[in-house]
């Protein structure tokens, strides 16, 4: 599911796929969150092959991890509703800052080269939607940063709604699959 957004060019979409990743990270820890992020990318590639020579997938992985890691590290330091909220806010802020800088420094220039178009053409797509977009930095400030803030807030709110009911199911399933049966003696 990818939802277009009115304030950014059409190649930017809100994708709620961080939701199961954050839930998994809350349930099983930061490493599990990163591994789930990686598996998410692999599944996406099986369902829909890359159209960006893996640059988009790299971006999705890195930006996703920039939210998941702070959120889950903070939550696992002392599991409570407060640390979940602080973790999600921190994760959203880190994702917004990292995603904005990553787009400005690496992704936009790489996509421009990859698609054989001047960087100004990409900036022009942002200008067509918002007259305040005049360069790379205003592009990421008015198009990328709001996208990441909205995505982080949406994933965080949905995680708060879904985590508590899913947590016992996830943990019971995990415990059942990892319990070793005593060996039988013959």
Which residues does each PLM region occupy?
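Alpha-helical transmembrane segments and their immediate interhelical/interface regions
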Residues: 48-86
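Alpha-helical transmembrane segments and their lipid-water interface positions
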Residues: 36, 40, 47, 67-71, ...
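Membrane-embedded alpha-helical hairpins and interfacial helices in multi-pass inner-membrane proteins
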Residues: 3-15, 54, 78-185
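Hydrophobic transmembrane alpha-helices
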Residues: 1-27, 31-36, 52, 67-75, 159, 163, ...
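Hydrophobic alpha-helical transmembrane segments
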Residues: 19, 34-38, 57-62, 85-90, ...
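Membrane-embedded alpha-helical segments of multi-pass membrane proteins
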Residues: 15-23, 58-66, 153
């Amino acid at each position: 599911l990818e939802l277009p957004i009115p304030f950014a060019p059409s190649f930017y979409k809100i994708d709620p796929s961080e939701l199961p990743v954050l839930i998994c990270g809350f349930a099983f820890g930061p490493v599990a969150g990163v591994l789930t992020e990686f598996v998410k990318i692999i599944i996406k590639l099986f369902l829909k092959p890359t159209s960006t020579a893996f640059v988009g997938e790299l971006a999705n992985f890195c930006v996703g991890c920039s939210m998941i890691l702070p959120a889950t590290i903070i939550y696992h330091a002392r599991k409570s509703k407060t640390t979940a909220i602080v973790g999600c806010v921190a994760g959203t802020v880190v994702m917004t800052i990292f995603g904005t800088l990553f787009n400005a420094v690496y992704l936009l220039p790489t996509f421009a080269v990859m698609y054989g178009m001047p960087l100004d053409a990409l900036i022009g797509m942002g200008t067509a939607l918002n007259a305040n977009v005049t360069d790379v930095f205003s592009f990421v400030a008015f198009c990328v940063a709001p996208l990441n803030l909205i995505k982080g807030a949406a994933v965080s709110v949905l995680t708060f709604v879904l985590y508590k009911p899913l947590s016992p199911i996830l943990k019971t399933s995990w415990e059942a699959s990892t319990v070793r049966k005593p060996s039988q003696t013959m």
